[in-house]
Design a protein with these regions (language model features):
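Small-residue-rich helix-interface/hinge motifs
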Residues: 4-77, 278-297
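Functional transmembrane alpha-helices
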Residues: 81, 85, 179, 185-274, ...
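Conserved PDZ fold ligand-binding element
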Residues: 132-154, 309
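Hydrophobic membrane-targeting alpha-helices
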Residues: 107, 111-115, 273, 277, ...
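Internal alpha-helical transmembrane segments
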Residues: 8, 19, 30, 37, ...
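Alpha-helical transmembrane segments of integral membrane proteins
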Residues: 4-8, 12, 88-93, 259-263
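Alpha-helical transmembrane segments of multi-pass membrane proteins
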Residues: 13-17, 68, 101, 268-276, ...
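PDZ-domain C-terminal substructure recognizer with occasional recognition of PDZ-binding tails
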Residues: 138, 144-145, 158-200
Length: 334
């Protein structure tokens, strides 16, 4: 991987982190909470500028970033501090970073599908020797329903065919404005169940947005399943990568064009959002959990106890990040 690719990958990763932190920043500002510092990167200071009450900084280590909100980590006498806001405002501010990651993911995917084309249920090609061709289905036909259920998302069609495991499926098709019904049985090929059909790609902003939401939803489901398997010991920790691994993957995708890089950025942004919502100390999800715990217990858990918990969580998180960096260097560089 070239030096240029590494630098570009680091910049792109920093932009994703900046997007996350901007979510916290924007929510805090909108809800009247004082923001003392907005930083991209961590560690030694490279650049700093004061604008109004907020200090904007760029730091040397591209391993994260932060938005320093008044009173977030302890008591503050400032009337505009985080701690003096109602519980719902705290939750909004804490969740805004992940929300921004989700928005960024959808925006990036929308751009990709608008440019490259979004999936449709109209067929572009019918392959020789597969069930669809044998049943007389033609390119240009549109899938309207399967087994009486309407379908307008190609990936749902793919999932339904794969889940059928070769059982008969009733396809309602449209050709030249007329409907017809045919029964197909999927054929297994290389471990998958296939009908031998390929969808047509359409360059439509509406379809692009719909495909972006569909892809985001299915990816979130897959990530959620992975997190459950990881914490229950059913998935390997070898599949988890750190900053070095992420930068390496972005650099590798750069070889295949900008579309691949943007797609990977969208998935990484989604991953950042979901990881930050995990209910673990020091993460946004852990802080949100404490907001509800303190609401239910009527603040029987004080700022000091919460602060110590998050501090321990941060130490463990930094240790995990250091371990992942060490392992990624050995895996991707050495």
């Amino acid at each position: 991987m070239s030096v240029f690719a590494i630098i570009a990958a680091i910049i792109l990763f920093c932009l994703l982190v900046a997007g996350h932190e901007f979510g916290h920043y924007a929510a805090a500002k909108l809800l009247g909470v004082r923001v003392n510092e907005f930083s991209v990167g961590m560690g030694p200071l490279i650049f700093q500028k004061q604008h109004g009450e907020t200090e904007y900084s760029l730091r040397a280590l591209p391993i994260g970033g932060y938005c320093k909100i008044e009173g977030e980590d302890g008591d503050s006498e400032d009337d505009r501090s985080f701690g003096r806001k109602p519980w719902w405002a705290k939750v909004i501010i804490l969740a805004a970073g992940a929300f921004m990651n989700f928005v960024l993911c959808i925006v990036l995917l929308t751009g990709i599908f608008w440019y490259s084309g979004a999936y449709s249920t109209t067929l572009a090609e019918v392959s020789d020797g597969f069930p669809a061709q044998a049943a007389g289905i033609q390119a240009g036909d549109t899938i309207v329903a399967i087994d009486g259920k309407a379908y307008d998302d190609w990936m749902d069609v793919v999932d339904a065919i794969d889940a059928s495991e070769g059982a008969p499926m009733s396809f309602t098709m449209e050709r030249d404005g007329a409907l017809y019904v045919t029964v197909l049985e999927a054929q297994q090929s290389e471990g998958r169940w296939l009908m031998g059909i390929t969808c047509k790609l359409v360059h439509s902003p509406v379809k692009a947005v719909a495909q972006a939401f569909s892809t985001t939803r299915s990816t979130m489901q897959a990530m959620g399943q992975f997190f459950v398997q990881l914490f229950t010991g059913k998935a390997s920790g070898d599949d988890v990568v750190g900053v070095v691994g992420i930068v390496s993957m972005i650099g590798e995708q750069a070889k295949f064009g900008i579309v691949n890089v943007v797609y990977l950025m969208a998935i990484i942004s989604l991953n950042l959002g979901m990881v930050n919502l995990l209910p673990l100390p020091a993460l946004d999800g852990g802080r949100i959990l404490f907001v509800f715990i303190r609401l239910i217990t009527r603040d029987k858990i004080g700022d000091r106890a919460e602060g110590i918990t998050h501090a321990i969580g941060m130490v463990l998180l930094l240790a995990l990040m250091a371990f992942l960096v060490f392992r990624d260097v050995n895996r991707f560089i050495l």
